[in-house]
Regions:
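Hydrophobic alpha-helical transmembrane segments of multi-pass inner-membrane transport and secretion
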Residues: 15-43, 250-290, 308-325, 354-362, ...
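Hydrophobic secondary-structure segments that place a key small or acidic residue at a functional site
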Residues: 125-193, 528-587
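Peri-transmembrane interface segments
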Residues: 17, 39, 43-50, 218-268, ...
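Short helix-loop junctions at transmembrane helix boundaries
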Residues: 322-355, 695, 706-774
Length: 779
């Protein structure tokens, strides 16, 4: 065994450059794998920690203002109820600004404002946040990355500017991110809460019930039971803890999954490069291998020595990668908190540790086992003759005497076809890198620069201005006549509506629009919009849950009466909103189950969206009792975390791609210069300049890199949407089209080519130091 380690140790010393390159690749792969698995598992741990620490309710029930004790009796009458706590909440649309911003820069968003003098056991907040002062406010945890404790924070409600100091940040699983209940969770003093309630529409002040169920209770069944127990004229908004679990970890899961996919590609590339490195080592040291064989070493023992060498690199690189991941605990904690809105990141993840410790060395073992099979084919005589056989029967595709290409290009093509396997490996590496970089740019384009694709996936109809007014037809008529307005639609969302088909039942949210044909952000899959009063559109997720197809009849529970009302499934769409648990109706359709229906929000679309802020100010003057929000602000606040995550992924992909291209080119060019040292010396003796020889070396790798880039772009075009579809499938997303503009493909190609050319040029500078006479004497 010592002999194997002795050979492996000396081999490592002999080609330190290649060892360093392989180590760097494996280190990067190990660190990314450890960090991404840690991040993806941290979400569930943070959720569990939040549940235990703050006693998360199994169900929340938000109802319009009614008698508090009556609501308590109704909920407690449901057998599975173990505990119920009820507090008032003000659901408002407001403008806010902080830090260096002023009132002119205020951003619109919705708030769920709670009274800090009413602490609860379920969905609790820390004791230090009880009975706040009038100038103090507590905000959701994910805002801690944009606002510091003690900083100024202003909310404009009903024309009054409330100036606060940030007291701290609370973790509430139901408001953990904008993917949960859309709106900022806020705690204020009792007096400020009462003042706010007096300023807003009474409809906005509701009761917020937190319910704990008995052990073993099915939460969905309990949700249905609570809704059925409520009076028929009450339309509740209910959310289960299971839905919040998915929503809280959604962005973390998406971001981490994409990084894991890239990491797996990186591992595959590392194995390919290792395979080439082993082949190259055998080629360059074939005489030494022959001497060892002649002295009694078998092919098996030499093969084991090579595998041992690669395993040493792999194990040390894995350990270093894990250490690097552990040192990244603070950045990971920051990223986890920003994506999940919770602070429960606990650092080292044992599953991530085990997966990395086992995964990377195992891939190295398998890759080196396959690559070292060449040892079995070597004979002593062939090895001592430097592997040169008497004849080469391969076709000469580029005869120099008849070829019209430039000499450097012709020689480059001869080299590539002469070492076809190596060329294929390089093409595969560059293709995978190109594909992953294009994916990063596609995410950046579709989610960060232009969010139309994201908005369609979310499935929320964002307008230029959103007005929170209930059933005011005069307002709709007046605004529609405004010359600055392009169109007006209405939106009302009913949550937790019971829909059944045969023996299957589900609870979902229903979006109701006045003009369904005017929708701009709906992602329709099949069928048609619910134009008639007896039609309903279900998301792909809900249609799968119920097992329905187009034309089937589902029963929707009446909101103002008893029994159910039948609807025909006229279409299937898809959306991430409410984790895919959605349906859509027209106003005529909703009135069949809610005869008291009145719209809740007016969606105002402008001819010139750039003037939205001016139009909003004028509307606030004309209608002081109506709350207005800028659609752009709502979009920004809702998807800000997603955009930052996609920007981060793009940066990771680009940096890692440049890093791998540089390392690959270092390995290839260095090996080429060493392998062709004699040929280069002869060429110099024949009169070729160092510049010409460097140019020839550069040209050798350019054809394979160019082909790899083209192949990678084609792979991106062919398979990237399928990859995205797999990542988003847990939202019920069935169809997705991410556009990648030509400019990003050109940037990717240029990035890889520039990195490859510059690296190859710098690493081939050693040609200038070659001395023909000395080289020929050595030979």
């Amino acid at each position: 065994m010592y002999k194997l380690f002795f050979i492996a140790k000396n081999n490592l010393k002999k080609h330190k450059g290649e060892v360093a390159i392989l180590f760097a690749l494996m280190f990067l792969a190990a660190m990314l794998l450890f960090c991404s698995i840690t991040l993806i598992l941290s979400g569930d741990k943070a959720v569990s920690a939040c549940k235990d620490k703050y006693h998360a309710a199994d169900l929340i029930v938000d109802v319009p203002q009614m008698d508090k004790e009556e609501l308590r009796k109704i909920i407690e009458s449901v057998d599975a109820t173990e505990k119920c706590e009820i507090v008032p909440v003000a659901q408002i649309a407001a403008d806010y600004y902080y830090g260096d911003m002023d009132s002119e820069d205020a951003v619109s968003f919705s708030y769920y404002v709670f009274d800090s003098s009413l602490p609860t056991y379920l969905n609790a907040f820390p004791e230090e946040f009880e009975n706040l002062k009038d100038d103090e406010i507590v905000l959701p945890y994910y805002l801690s990355y944009t606002n510091g404790i003690g900083e100024d924070y202003h909310i404009i409600i009903g024309g009054k500017d409330y100036a606060f100091k940030v007291k701290g940040y609370a973790e509430n699983l139901y408001f953990a991110t904008t993917m949960n209940i859309s709106g900022f969770y806020a705690l204020v003093s009792h007096d400020v809460f009462e003042e706010i309630c007096g300023k807003v529409d009474p409809v906005s002040v509701q009761l917020f019930a937190s319910c704990k169920t008995k052990e073993g209770t099915d939460i969905d069944d309990y949700d249905v039971a609570v809704q059925r127990a409520l009076p028929s004229d009450i339309t509740p908004f209910t959310v289960t803890i299971d839905t919040m679990d998915v929503a809280t970890t959604a962005i973390t899961t998406i971001a981490s999954s994409l990084i894991i996919v890239f990491t797996l590609l990186l591992i595959v590339m590392s194995v390919i490069i290792m395979h080439f490195s082993i082949k190259n080592f055998i080629e360059l040291n074939i005489q030494n291998i022959g001497l060892l064989q002649a002295t009694g070493y078998t092919a098996k023992s030499l093969r084991l020595a090579c595998i041992t060498e690669q395993m040493i690199i792999g194990v040390i690189a894995t350990a270093a990668g894990i250490l690097g991941g552990i040192l990244c605990t603070d950045p990971l904690r920051y990223l986890s908190g920003m994506l999940s809105g919770l602070s429960g990141f606990d650092g080292i993840s044992v599953p991530a540790l085990v997966s990395t410790i086992v995964g990377i060395p195992l891939m190295v073992l398998v890759g080196s086992f396959i690559a070292t099979r060449s040892y079995k084919k070597l004979t002593v005589l062939e090895s001592l003759r430097s592997g040169i056989t008497s004849h080469n029967f391969k076709k000469n595709h580029f005869p120099l005497e008849t070829n019209r290409m430039p000499l450097s290009l012709a020689l480059a093509c001869k080299n590539n076809f002469g070492a076809l396997k190596k060329s294929i490996f390089v093409i595969l590496i560059i293709a995978l890198l190109t594909m992953s970089t294009c994916i990063g740019f596609a995410l950046f384009q579709n989610w960060a620069l232009d969010n139309k694709t994201l908005l369609r996936l979310v499935g929320y109809e964002f307008s230029d201005i959103e007005a929170g007014t209930v059933g005011d037809e005069d307002f709709i008529e007046a605004v529609s006549k405004d010359p600055a307005v392009r169109k007006v639609n209405t939106l009302t969302t009913f949550q937790s509506v019971e829909v059944s088909y045969q023996d299957k039942t589900t609870s979902l949210g229903i979006d109701v629009y006045r003009n369904v044909n005017a929708l701009e952000n709906n992602y329709f899959l099949e069928g048609h919009l619910p134009e008639k009063e007896n039609e309903i559109v279900l998301t792909n997720m809900e249609s799968d849950i119920l097992g329905v197809t187009l034309g089937d009849i589902v029963n929707v529970k009446s909101m103002t009466g008893t029994g159910t009302v039948p609807y025909i499934v006229s279409g299937i769409d898809q959306k991430m909103n409410n984790t895919g648990k959605k349906a859509m109706m027209s106003e005529a359709g909703i009135k069949r189950i809610n005869s008291d229906y009145q719209y809740m929000s007016a969606l105002i679309f402008l001819n010139d969206p750039s003037k939205a802020k001016e139009v909003k100010k004028q509307l606030e003057k004309d209608y002081p009792n109506i709350q207005f929000m800028l659609g752009e602000d709502v979009i920004g606040s809702s998807i800000e975390t997603v955009v930052k995550a996609m920007e981060g992924i793009c940066v990771i992909f680009v940096i890692a791609t440049c890093f791998v291209v540089i390392l690959t080119q270092l390995l290839l060019t260095r090996a080429q210069v060493i392998r062709e040292r004699t040929d280069l010396g002869v060429s110099k003796a024949l009169g070729y300049t160092s510049g010409e020889l460097i140019r020839r070396t550069l040209m050798t790798n350019m054809p394979t890199i160019t082909i790899g880039i083209i192949l990678g772009i084609l792979l991106h075009i062919a398979f990237s949407n399928q990859l995205f579809l797999t990542v988003f499938s847990f939202f019920g997303i069935k169809q997705i089209i991410f556009q990648t503009d030509l400019i990003w493909l050109v940037i990717t190609a240029a990035l890889i080519l520039v990195c490859a050319l510059v690296t190859a040029f710098l690493s081939s500078r050693g040609i200038t130091k070659l001395e023909p006479v000395r080289i020929l004497k050595e030979e």
